[in-house]
């Protein structure tokens, strides 16, 4: 952990969650310090996306507690959790195709009048949008829509960012740009990040720690700068 990291920003204790007929997360406990980035890795169907949706309140908790910056959000609806300072970029594209790029970026702002100031801050990280704000988001490529989700999350200036496979299907140059944006966000604002990622080099670059999920449980974890971290991660993904 760096010196910028502080008290626990995201704390899950004994969280059990799932869908109507199935339990996916099984008494999962984990903590993320303020300013820290943790990468969640594992094969598909192991509970990673369920974990983020549970944190955001999209799935009911059957047991356990979730705290955001010390506040119990276990029973709060998604919009209240967002107001508590949590921004979520889901795996599926959540872009409003018929709205302009500008209007998509404004959606997460409590005060729409803050757009110009926020975009002046975030826009240079995503130059593809700077001259296209009036265009419909539906004109963007799949990769550009992913970047729009990330830019929208950064515009909110949250204390916690949740990202679900934001690099999936992207070109290496775009992945590098996203890594730079996340590192910038963490350095400038001390933002806490919890991200699901299958692109291991990206995870190792932007995260301080990693956790491997299997069948809704954390089966391994470590620091990304540990010798052998990459091999440990790949060994779980290969099995």
Residue ranges and their predicted role:
Residues 165-166:
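Walker B catalytic motif
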Residues 176-189:
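Helical segment within the ABC ATPase nucleotide-binding domain
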Residues 136-140, 144:
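Conserved ABC ATPase signature
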Residues 153-154:
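ABC ATPase C-loop
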Residues 56:
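Helix-to-loop junction immediately C-terminal to a conserved catalytic motif
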Residues 60, 72-92, 131-134, 226-233:
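ABC ATPase NBD coupling module
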């Amino acid at each position: 952990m760096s010196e910028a990291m502080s008290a626990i920003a995201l704390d899950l204790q004994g969280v059990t969650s799932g869908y109507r007929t199935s339990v996916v997360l099984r008494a999962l406990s984990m903590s993320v310090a303020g300013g820290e980035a943790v990468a969640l890795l594992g094969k598909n169907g192991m509970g990673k996306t369920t974990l983020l949706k549970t944190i955001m309140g999209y799935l009911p908790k059957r047991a356990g507690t979730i705290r955001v910056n010390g506040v119990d959000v276990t029973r709060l609806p998604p919009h209240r959790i967002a107001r508590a300072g949590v921004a979520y970029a889901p795996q599926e594209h959540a872009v409003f195709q018929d709205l302009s790029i500008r209007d998509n970026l404004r959606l997460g702002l409590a005060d729409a009048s803050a757009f110009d100031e926020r975009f002046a801050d975030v826009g240079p990280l995503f130059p593809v949008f700077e001259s296209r704000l009036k265009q419909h988001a539906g004109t963007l490529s799949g990769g550009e829509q992913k970047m729009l989700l990330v830019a929208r999350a950064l515009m909110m200036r949250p204390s916690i960012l949740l990202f679900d496979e934001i690099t999936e299907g992207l070109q290496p140059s775009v992945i590098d740009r996203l890594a730079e944006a996340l590192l910038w966000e963490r350095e400038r604002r001390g933002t806490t990040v919890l991200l699901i990622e299958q692109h291991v080099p990206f995870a190792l670059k932007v995260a301080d720690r990693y956790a491997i999920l299997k069948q809704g449980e954390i089966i391994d974890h470590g620091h990304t700068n540990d010798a052998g971290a990459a091999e440990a991660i790949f060994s779980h993904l290969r099995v």
